[in-house]
Amino acid sequence: MDPVDPNLEPWNHPGSQPKTACNRCHCKKCCYHCQVCFITKGLGISYGRKKRRQRRRPSQGGQTHQDPIPKQPSSQPRGNPTGPKE
């Protein structure tokens, strides 16, 4: 390894910055372009704000595609209706 000038900041060391700018391409070469590209493109990790999904509007026909819940008969007591045997 070549000695690095101690007066340079770490982000200005030779080889610390890629020669080309980052782009939106997700090919294998661009995914390994730099550490930031690898994290965002290769691993898919993004800490930015997430876009809101638009809710689907209900159809204009008024159909909900759901059957109404039928009324159930009143619940029957469980167990032996005459009581426990002794």
From Swiss-Prot:
Stretches assigned to coiled coil: none
Protein name: Protein Tat
Organism listed in the record: Human immunodeficiency virus type 1 group M subtype D (isolate Z6) (HIV-1)
Biased composition (Polar residues): 60-79
Biased segments, Basic residues type: 48-58
HAMAP family registered for this protein in UniProt: HIV_TAT
Post-translational modification, as annotated: Asymmetrical arginine methylation by host PRMT6 seems to diminish the transactivation capacity of Tat and affects the interaction with host CCNT1. Acetylation by EP300, CREBBP, GCN5L2/GCN5 and PCAF regulates the transactivation activity of Tat. EP300-mediated acetylation of Lys-50 promotes dissociation of Tat from the TAR RNA through the competitive binding to PCAF's bromodomain. In addition, the non-acetylated Tat's N-terminus can also interact with PCAF. PCAF-mediated acetylation of Lys-28 enhances Tat's binding to CCNT1. Lys-50 is deacetylated by SIRT1.
Protein function: Transcriptional activator that increases RNA Pol II processivity, thereby increasing the level of full-length viral transcripts. Recognizes a hairpin structure at the 5'-LTR of the nascent viral mRNAs referred to as the transactivation responsive RNA element (TAR) and recruits the cyclin T1-CDK9 complex (P-TEFb complex) that will in turn hyperphosphorylate the RNA polymerase II to allow efficient elongation. The CDK9 component of P-TEFb and other Tat-activated kinases hyperphosphorylate the C-terminus of RNA Pol II that becomes stabilized and much more processive.
Residue list for modification N6-acetyllysine: K28, K50, K51
Binding site for Zn(2+) 1: C22, H33, C34, C37
Record gene name: tat
Source organism phylogeny: Viruses, Riboviria, Pararnavirae, Artverviricota, Revtraviricetes
Pfam name, any one: Tat
Residues that bind Zn(2+) 2: C25, C27, C30
Segments of this protein annotated with the region Interaction with the host capping enzyme RNGTT: 49-86
Disordered, as annotated region: 1-21, 47-86
Family from the record: Belongs to the lentiviruses Tat family.
Quaternary structure (record): Interacts with host CCNT1. Associates with the P-TEFb complex composed at least of Tat, P-TEFb (CDK9 and CCNT1), TAR RNA, RNA Pol II. Recruits the HATs CREBBP, TAF1/TFIID, EP300, PCAF and GCN5L2. Interacts with host KAT5/Tip60; this interaction targets the latter to degradation. Interacts with the host deacetylase SIRT1. Interacts with host capping enzyme RNGTT; this interaction stimulates RNGTT. Binds to host KDR, and to the host integrins ITGAV/ITGB3 and ITGA5/ITGB1. Interacts with host KPNB1/importin beta-1 without previous binding to KPNA1/importin alpha-1. Interacts with EIF2AK2.
Ranges for region Interaction with human CREBBP: 1-24
Residue numbers carrying Asymmetric dimethylarginine: R52, R53
Localisation: Host nucleus, Host nucleolus; Host cytoplasm; Secreted
Site (Essential for Tat translocation through the endosomal membrane): W11
Principal location: host cell
